[in-house]
Amino acid sequence: MSSNRVLDLFKPFESFLPEVIAPERKVPYNQKLIWTGVSLLIFLILGQIPLYGIVSSETSDPLYWLRAMLASNRGTLLELGVSPIITSSMIFQFLQGTQLLQIRPESKQDRELFQIAQKVCAIILILGQALVVVMTGNYGAPSDLGLPICLLLIFQLMFASLIVMLLDELLSKGYGLGSGISLFTATNIAEQIFWRAFAPTTVNSGRGKEFEGAVIAFFHLLAVRKDKKRALVEAFYRTNLPNMFQVLMTVAIFLFVLYLQGFRYELPIRSTKVRGQIGIYPIKLFYTSNTPIMLQSALTSNIFLISQILFQKYPTNPLIRLIGVWGIRPGTQGPQMALSGLAYYIQPLMSLSEALLDPIKTIVYITFVLGSCAVFSKTWIEISGTSPRDIAKQFKDQGMVINGKRETSIYRELKKIIPTAAAFGGATIGALSVGSDLLGTLGSGASILMATTTIYGYYEAAAKEGGFTKNLVPGFSDLM
């Protein structure tokens, strides 16, 4: 069966799949802002509504470290977050990248069928993940819940995930300023970072009652402690709670990523239609934006989820233990973590000391993150319409050629630059993620990068639509 025939199998689903109709004309900037704001508000509301019928949600959480990246809130309608949608995209990226599924980019029908296939896969994954979450006892033993409550929980999870999928489609089809998935994820990350920095709640520690938020704790410690030097040290380096060092590292990483956004390779181009008209085509360092780290997180989350579920069911099976052994790390009261196996080696490094104490894990983890981000970035360009062939076609349609090169050599020249730039940019974003984890930030390195690149991308889109300056950080673009 040919790959085109495989795509044709999804054509019958077109008539009854939920779909957002693309706008007939360009949506005005002000309306895009409204649609983006309303979509974000709906998403935030879904993340605050608890699931009806839960007996308990105090079981181990295999996705604890990745919930921010997946825009997931435990025990709410957004339990699944954007994981099924990203996973579906990752699966079809793999199928296309390995030539198991081929589409003709110039064919509108192929592109539409490809999107339908992705949507069908996402719905199947939504159902599958909802079944797994409910039937593995995350909200109480299924026998205690009963069949009606189990079905109700599955329905709630599916309904909310379908709403998220349609909101993403709404924004991506031109009603909003960009990708809904990126926006939802960045908002969830920013919300968690803000809470860790400014949370007014208090917790009981060995040092007495302390404010959870790092900034509030900083001022509180300076106000109540007589020994100001000791208060400063405690505020900057306290353990098991957010501290000011993490706040400063988060701000530093944010600004550094903004700085790197200005790095690009400028390809000189000229017009074949207007004599003397020249310009540049910029190829950015982050050519595929935050897509590599998003897909890498989706891959990791699925491995973690499957590993922990299998370990709970078959804890003594040697093959299952090879995939991952889960438990609470000795000397901590935190969530369950991978203690050995494959899951342990791809689990994020929590600190520089952990990296030094286990160099084998450090090498494996860094290789995995950099390699997977580079591969995802390089293959993503074939799907997203930014491959050398796609850009060469744009040049031809617009009557542009590379300065000093013949028109027939455009594709060959772009093929030398774009795949390398995409892979290098993906590896760079992976390296920044690992570095952020080692330095210590309010959240994982991947989540900080995801939020920063999304915020910058949305700012650029708003600047383009609204016609104002793109210089987000004064002076940064001048250094390029």
UniProtKB/Swiss-Prot annotation:
Q: What is the effect of changing R275 to E/F/V?
A: Severe growth defect; lowers SRP-dependent and SRP-independent translocation
- InterPro entries assigned to the protein according to its UniProt record, in alphabetical order: SecY/SEC61-alpha, SecY_CS, SecY_dom_sf, Translocon_Sec61/SecY_plug_dom
Where, subcellularly, is it found?
A: Endoplasmic reticulum membrane
**Outcome following mutation: R406E:** Severe growth defect; lowers SRP-dependent and SRP-independent translocation
Role summary: Part of the Sec61 complex, which is the major component of a channel-forming translocon complex that mediates protein translocation across the endoplasmic reticulum (ER). The functional states of the translocon complex include co- and post-translational ER import, cotranslational membrane protein integration and retrograde transport of misfolded proteins out of the ER. In the cotranslational pathway, ribosomes synthesizing presecretory proteins are targeted to the translocon by the cytosolic signal recognition particle (SRP) and its ER-localized receptor.
| Topology, Lumenal side | 56-75, 142-146, 225-240, 312-361, 435-437
Organism annotation: Saccharomyces cerevisiae (strain ATCC 204508 / S288c) (Baker's yeast)
- Sorted alphabetically, which NCBIfam families does this protein's record hold? 3a0501s007 (TIGR00967), PRK08568.1-5 (NF006341)
Report keywords, A-Z: Endoplasmic reticulum, Membrane, Protein transport, Translocation, Transmembrane, Transmembrane helix, Transport
Any one of the GO CC terms = endoplasmic reticulum
Fill in the subunit field for this protein.
Component of the heterotrimeric Sec61 complex, which is composed of SEC61, SBH1 and SSS1. Presumably three to four Sec61 heterotrimers assemble into an oligomeric ring with a central aqueous pore. In cotranslational ER import, the pore diameter varies from 9-15 A in a ribosome-free resting state to 40-60 A in a functional state when associated with the ribosome. The Sec61 complex is part of a channel-forming translocon complex whose composition seem to change dependent upon different functional states.
The molecule here is called Protein transport protein SEC61
State whether keyword Protein transport applies: yes
For this UniProt entry, which segments traverse the membrane?
33-55, 76-95, 120-141, 147-167, 213-224, 241-260, 291-311, 362-381, 417-434, 438-459
GO molecular function terms attached to this record: peptide transmembrane transporter activity; protein transmembrane transporter activity; protein-transporting ATPase activity; ribosome binding; signal sequence binding
Known Gene3D superfamilies for this protein? Answer: SecY subunit domain
Instruction: Relate the outcome reported for changing R406D.
Output: Severe growth defect; lowers SRP-dependent translocation
Q: Which Pfam families match?
A: Plug_translocon, SecY
GO terms for biological process?
ERAD pathway; misfolded protein transport; post-translational protein targeting to membrane, translocation; retrograde protein transport, ER to cytosol; SRP-dependent cotranslational protein targeting to membrane, translocation
